[in-house]
Amino acid sequence: MPQVQVKMRLKKIKKSIMITTLIGLLVTLSLAPIIWELITSFKLNEDILKIPLVYFPNQITLDHYTQLFTTHPFWRYIINSAFVASTSTILSLIFGTPAAYALARLNPWGSKIIISSILIITLFPGILLLSGLLEIVRFLHLGNNYLSIIIPYSAINLPLTILVLRNFFKQLPKELEDAAKIDGYNTIQMLLRIILPITTPALITTGILSFIFAWNEFIFALTFITREEMKTIPIAVAQIGGTTEFEIPYGPIAAATMISTLPLMLIVLFFQNKIIQGLTSGAIKG
């Protein structure tokens, strides 16, 4: 009996070591690009271009960060990205939440067809909309107008918002709505006063995913926004140039990458528990 227990314990230890090693490897692979960019952003130009590579420099510098804010209106780019991403996220939640609730709880006619259509739409990349949107923007004279990117961002995020929130709404107990109806609540009052307060994890999850997409989107912003003071961070980072046309400014690009990534990292870290709840809740039922 003791031998069997020893073998079982050794087996558990081996399994634990394997799982820990695998997780450590995955974490390392995931963090390696970020760590490399972070180190590069603090390197001197000589260390960045030195061969063999200097992995950990003896001297660090903040010149690349100060250069961003002295030679470029980088704070303006951050504010632009925050405004566009926040507005498009709010719009996608405003329109997506009632649609998801209707599909999950009210069972309208043709709901299965609607859901299937939403799933099919998610299979197509947003870039396919570019030529059509370009004609619409020209016709409505929306060039260099934030509406030309806010509306497409909201529309592209709508399917994700509807699908995630629908799965969350479907697992809510029907007794909540029955009790609300007895108290005299109509559908809109039920949604605003009862359903939404208990669906915070799902709302935060879909909101953050929508925000990240809008923050990082490049093609639409590059096409529809050309005025310097209206550009978003991805465009600003892509257009960082060196002192000559042959120079690649690795340091400033790395610094800009870290600055543009930091807000997203902080948001995800702050709301990580809500994100996990929101993503797993729809997988339990529905």
Regions found by a protein language model. Name each.
Residues M1-K12:
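Short, Lys/Arg-rich, polar N-terminal cytosolic tail immediately upstream
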Residues R9, K15-G286:
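A structural signal for multi-pass alpha-helical bundles of membrane permease subunits
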